Amino acid sequence: MFFKKITLIPFVMLINLYRYCISPFIPARCRYYPTCSEYALEALKTHGILKGLYLTTRRLLRCHPLSKRDYYDLVPCKNKKG
């Protein structure tokens, strides 16, 4: 568990760098709730690096003006076998 949190730090830092240093200077344009950066943080924390990056990439590719997807796009729950 500790190793998982340590490996997430660089990704969380990059997302926060975008959120607090870059995002304030560009107009808000995310089509979804939660925003893409919030989604990325949640996906990484819930699913880990590999699946979290996969889900984040899919989300970013869907976030464009021509998208006909629903407004709410939540991170999928983590399936637990057993």
UniProtKB/Swiss-Prot annotation:
Superkingdom to which the source organism belongs: Bacteria
Entry keyword annotation includes Repeat: no
Pfam family name, one: YidD
Annotated protein name in UniProt: Putative membrane protein insertion efficiency factor
Record's GO cellular component terms: plasma membrane
Keywords, comma-separated and alphabetical: Cell inner membrane, Cell membrane, Membrane
Predominant localisation class: membrane
Protein's cellular compartments: Cell inner membrane
Membrane topology, record value: Peripheral membrane protein
Role summary: Could be involved in insertion of integral membrane proteins into the membrane.
Similarity comment: family membership: Belongs to the UPF0161 family.
